[in-house]
Structure formats: C-alpha cells, structure tokens
Amino acid sequence: MTDLNLPSIFVPLVGLMFPAIAMASLSLHIQKNKII
C-alpha cells in the first residue's frame, strides 16, 4: 500500500512545488532588476 500511496502523493506535490518555486524565483529576479 505504501509503495502505491507514496508516488500518488509525491508526484502532485512536486508538480505543484516546482512551478511555485520557479515563479517565486522569477518574480524575485524581476523585482531585483526593477530596483536596479
């Protein structure tokens, strides 16, 4: 059960976290460029 449960929780978590981190780093990069 755990072998089937872990990927089903892990994959959507990564699928949501990776774009969120990418968007956050992108927005911070844009803010730094605007300030400078």
From Swiss-Prot:
The keyword Transmembrane helix applies. The keyword NADP does not apply. One of its GO terms (biological process) is photosynthesis. The chain crosses the membrane at residues 6-28. Pfam families: PSI_8. InterPro entries: PSI_PsaI, PSI_PsaI_sf. It is a single-pass membrane protein. Keywords: Chloroplast, Membrane, Photosynthesis, Photosystem I, Plastid, Thylakoid, Transmembrane, Transmembrane helix. May help in the organization of the PsaL subunit. Belongs to the PsaI family. This is Photosystem I reaction center subunit VIII. The lineage of its organism: Eukaryota, Viridiplantae, Streptophyta, Embryophyta, Tracheophyta.
